[in-house]
Amino acid sequence: MPEGTPGLGKTSLVLDDGRIILIINAMCNLFMPKNDFVFRSIEESLLNLELGKDYNAIFIDLHGEATSEKIAIANYFDGKVSAIVGTHTHVPTSDARILPNGTAFQTDVGMCGNYDSVIGMEKSLAIDRFFSKKSHLTVAEGEITICGVCVETDDYSGKSLSIEPIRIGGVLTPTWLNLVNIGDIYGWPF
């Protein structure tokens, strides 16, 4: 992100069992040229770090407009991080996969919000904005869909073993994996 931007850009989480996860938030450049060069920013965040040695898992939230840029970044960093998951476009892609060197990837996980909308905004106002360019947008009311991914990693290598998209509720077709399944698998209390 540009120098002086609030926030950390990356943070470490230490789990109760001692495993350590590094989470990086990176901002892409296509259609967002004021951001720092994303490849270099990620490289600087990973400088002198080894997946599986310094961290049990490294997860990148890749915020960007262009699918091509996100896919290029994922292939460039394949094997150096556990997972790269795209955000920003509000619409989930159906390309969740493990790349050849062990990095889980999905171009965009989509939004958590009402999909009976225009990317989460009230439809009539969003449509009017295309005609008048003056409309103020408001968040769409209604049932929300929770979108995300569940990534399983190897505790020693940090490489991904699986990635499963999550879509629960609302108007999108749900995935087979839901919070009840995840809770049962990992012993979570919900």
What positions do the PLM features span?
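Acidic, metal/ion-coordinating pockets
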Residues: 1-190
